[in-house]
């Protein structure tokens, strides 16, 4: 598949992979940060490292507009809407087809999205700090690493493989907080929840050929999410 988007340099790819590995190691050791300040600090460091490592890629993406701004804005909004609808459909299908014990036990509902629950706790502690890392740091870091680095490095060679690998890695990393002490069915439910988001954001990256589109879509998604916790 021939894409005209700005590629990452080999040096950026190597350094980005090292950053991703260090982030994963940190999350494995400390799956749940104890406070909103600690979470903000973690994402601030990741954000600074990501911007530094991918500064050439980001500068080139901003200075060489291969896609009109109107198209970027349109697909950013479309990507968010499609990801939201796909997530709703996925959850409805799981709820309909899976046995009741996947969602309920003797005391009532027992399945919840741990990332959203943790974010709600952070927002109640300090809303501005929670909004800062959720709306700015997280979208930039995750899109550059999962869509820009992993998906972008594979998409020119094999598009289906790029979708598959980036989706598995993205969903697996976001389920890390529930790996410890959780049952496999509980982990699987969390894993599946993140599939639609990755697929939609990869799709708008391919359609617009700029990493700025999924970054903006991710910002929109997280901004609306944090506003519901206000």
Can you name each region flagged by the protein language model?
Residues 14-19, 114-120, 165-171:
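Short, functional N-terminal and low-complexity linear motifs
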Residues 61-138:
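Juxtamembrane helix-loop-helix connectors linking adjacent transmembrane helices
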């Amino acid at each position: 598949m021939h894409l005209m988007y700005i590629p990452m340099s080999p040096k950026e790819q190597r350094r980005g992979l090292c950053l991703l590995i260090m982030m994963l190691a940190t999350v494995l050791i400390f799956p749940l940060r104890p406070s909103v300040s600690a979470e903000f600090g973690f994402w601030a460091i990741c954000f600074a490292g990501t911007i530094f490592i991918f500064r050439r890629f980001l500068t080139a993406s901003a200075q060489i507009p291969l896609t009109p701004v109107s198209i970027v804005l349109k697909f950013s909004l479309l990507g968010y809407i499609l990801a939201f609808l796909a997530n709703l459909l996925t959850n409805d299908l799981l709820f309909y087809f899976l046995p009741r014990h996947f969602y309920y036990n003797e005391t009532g509902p027992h399945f919840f999205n741990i990332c959203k629950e943790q974010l709600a706790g952070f927002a109640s502690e300090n809303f501005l700090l929670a909004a800062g890392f959720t709306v700015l740091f997280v979208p930039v870091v995750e899109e550059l690493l999962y869509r820009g680095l992993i998906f972008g490095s594979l998409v020119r060679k094999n598009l289906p493989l790029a979708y598959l690998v980036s989706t598995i890695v993205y969903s697996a990393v976001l389920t890390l907080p529930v790996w410890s002490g959780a049952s496999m069915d509980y982990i699987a439910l969390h894993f599946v929840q993140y599939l639609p988001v990755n697929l939609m954001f990869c799709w708008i990256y391919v359609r617009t050929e700029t990493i700025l589109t999924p970054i903006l879509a991710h910002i929109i998604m997280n901004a609306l999410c944090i506003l519901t916790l206000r």
